[in-house]
Amino acid sequence: MEPRAAVLKLIEHKHLTALEAESFMNHVMKGEVSEILLSSFLTAMRFNGESVEEVLGCTLALRKNALRPKTVFPFDLLDTCGTGGDGQGTINISTLSAIVLASLGIKVAKHGNRSVSSHTGSSDILTRLGYQTETTQEEVEAHLVNRGFTFLFAPMWHPSMKHAGPVRKELGFRTVFNMIGPLSNPFSPQFQIIGVYQPELMELFIKVLQSLGLKRALVCHSRDGLDEFSIFQITDYTFLENGVISRHSFDPKILGLSSLNKEEVYASSSDHAEVLARKVLNSESIAGTHAVALNAGAGLFVMGKIDTIEQGYQIAKEAILSGKTKKYFEDLISKE
């Protein structure tokens, strides 16, 4: 299908097949679609509501046009990349939980970018903490093999996205590109936890992950609006295991937490986000420790290392409080 035909189909309020969406996005990645046509495509798809097939097709195109690792990794990989954009201003919980997971022996290939709507994106906070995120492809792969943690800076691994950049910036609203980023880790991890900015996206994302063939994956959104597990409210999540999707809720009351200070997990600026992140790593933030441990616990659950998220939370919390995570991260950045 030619790009113009795909746009006309969307304008008629019809959804594209995965193949049609992939074809259009392949043209975009090669710089063969005009800014006007791409703008029309993104706007029409947004008005119709992105379908599973459309998101899947666009994801496949982004994956195919990404740089590929030269290394064959002989171990299971986890990514904790979320959509962001929940507008809540929390600390970088998914990034900090990735560090906790790596300190517990989980191989983490963290896919991320600079800030879009928050004070600090995953790349921003890691850089502030002393971890260099914009390195060579060879270094990124070596870090994973030798250290158990690496960061894939999205603009480096998805150079073809430069063709969509100006239109995305000019439009200024969420499009399918905000969805396919977390689904397009170039290392193709078979295990993934994704927080989404809207509850209705949980079903869409888990079905796309199912189609992509992941072994185990979890997509979550909390009832207080977070794109991660909340320590203050119930978190709903969809779960994929061996091709089967199930739906669940997690109530943090089961953890027995009380009198938590929300100010310990909400940042007012980039500098403040760094201060709060360091407090978590130094075991100086009660609420921050619980929030990061809970999300790391969910990661352990996705990896199949424990039977329940609660068990994972306890293990992750101990890693933070004992100083294990701090030592791991200090060793990590000392080798930079």
UniProtKB/Swiss-Prot annotation:
Enzyme class of the recorded protein, top EC level: transferase
Positions of anthranilate 2 binding: R168
Keyword Amino-acid biosynthesis: yes
GO process annotations (BP): L-tryptophan biosynthetic process
UniProt: Mg(2+) 2 binding residues: D227, E228
Binding site for Mg(2+) 1: S94, E228
GO molecular function terms attached to this record: anthranilate phosphoribosyltransferase activity; magnesium ion binding
Binding-site list for anthranilate 1: G82, N113
PANTHER family: ANTHRANILATE PHOSPHORIBOSYLTRANSFERASE
Role noted for this protein: Catalyzes the transfer of the phosphoribosyl group of 5-phosphorylribose-1-pyrophosphate (PRPP) to anthranilate to yield N-(5'-phosphoribosyl)-anthranilate (PRA).
Name of this chain's protein: Anthranilate phosphoribosyltransferase
UniProt gene name: trpD
